[in-house]
Regions:
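Generic recognition of stable, solvent-exposed alpha-helical segments in well-folded globular domains
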Residues: 43, 117-121, 125, 173-176, ...
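C-terminal substrate-binding/cap subdomain adjacent to the FAD-binding core in PCMH-type
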Residues: 1-140, 145
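N-terminal flexible segment immediately upstream of the FAD-binding catalytic core
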Residues: 91-108, 141-162, 227-238
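C-terminal hydrophobic structural anchor segments
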Residues: 140-198
C-alpha cells in the first residue's frame, strides 16, 4: 500500500474495496467530565473561542425562536465515574460513556464545516434565516468546534473548523430549509459532511476539496472497473 494510497483511503467512502484486516494503535480508556449549562446565544457566541481554548471539547445547541443556547464542554478528569450516569448534563464517566449521544427521535440532518474564524458570522446568518423564513422549525441548531486534520476530502482538511448542523423531523419536509441553509454555508466556504444531506454536484465538490483529483486517481487505480462505486459517487464522478 503506497503512502498516497493510505492518505486517500483514510476517508474512502466505501469506494476503495473491502478492508479485511487492520492493525490499530490504541490508548487506554480514560475518564471524562462533562459540564452543561444554559446561556443566551449572544453570550455563548461571544465566549465560544475562550471556551474552546479552555476545554477539550466544546459545543452548543441553539433553540430557534429563542435566545437560549445549551452549552456542553468535556474535559479529561481523574475523578471517579458516578452512577447511574445521566444521559447528558453534568456528569463523570468513561470516554465511551460520555462521548456518544443518545438520539432516539428520527430526523434528517445537514452538517457543514465552516472555517473557525468565520463560523460565528455564519451562525448569525443561519439564525436570521430561521427568524425570517423558517419560523416553523423547532429543531435545534448544533455548533461544535473541531480541530484540523490531514485527511484527503475531510471537511476539516488543513484548518480548524466549526461544524454547524441543522435538523428536521423524519416526517417533515426538509429540502427548502436545508437548501437555504446550504446556500449560507457555501458562502462561508463550508464543506458538507459526507454522511448527511447535501445537494452538491461533483463540480461543486471538486471546487471545495483541493485533494479531489488525487483522491479519484488513487481510487480508480485501485478499482479501475468501478466495482465499488455506488450510485451517489458515480453521480459525482460523471
Amino acid at each position: 500500500f503506497r503512502h498516497n494510497h493510505w492518505r486517500a483511503s483514510r476517508l474512502h467512502l466505501g469506494a476503495f474495496g473491502d478492508v479485511t484486516k487492520i492493525k490499530m494503535q490504541l490508548i487506554e480508556s480514560y475518564k471524562l467530565a462533562e459540564t452543561g449549562w444554559q446561556a443566551t446565544l449572544d453570550e455563548t457566541l461571544e465566549q465560544f473561542e475562550k471556551l474552546c481554548l479552555a476545554h477539550r471539547h466544546c459545543e452548543f445547541f441553539w433553540f430557534p425562536q429563542t435566545d437560549k443556547a445549551q452549552v456542553k464542554c468535556i474535559d479529561e478528569t481523574q475523578a471517579e465515574p458516578s452512577y447511574p450516569l445521566a444521559e447528558e448534563g453534568s456528569r463523570v464517566g468513561w470516554n465511551y460513556e460520555v462521548l456518544p449521544n443518545h438520539r432516539p427521535v428520527k430526523h434528517s440532518e445537514m452538517e457543514y464545516s465552516v472555517p473557525f474564524e468565520r463560523a460565528i458570522d455564519c451562525m448569525k446568518d443561519i439564525q436570521a434565516l430561521l427568524d425570517k423564513d423558517f419560523r416553523q422549525i423547532k429543531w435545534p441548531v448544533e455548533f461544535r468546534a473541531q480541530g484540523a486534520d490531514d485527511v484527503a476530502l475531510s471537511p476539516a482538511f488543513g484548518k480548524d473548523v466549526v461544524t454547524i448542523s441543522v435538523h428536521q423531523g423524519a416526517e417533515e419536509e426538509d429540502e427548502p430549509y436545508f437548501r437555504a441553509c446550504e446556500e449560507i454555508f457555501l458562502s462561508y466556504d463550508g464543506k458538507p459532511h459526507w454522511g448527511k444531506v447535501n445537494y452538491l454536484t461533483g463540480e461543486q465538490m471538486e471546487s471545495l476539496h483541493e485533494g479531489w483529483d488525487s483522491w479519484w486517481e488513487v481510487r480508480n487505480a485501485i478499482d479501475p472497473s468501478k466495482t465499488f462505486l455506488n450510485y451517489y459517487l458515480r453521480s459525482l464522478s460523471d
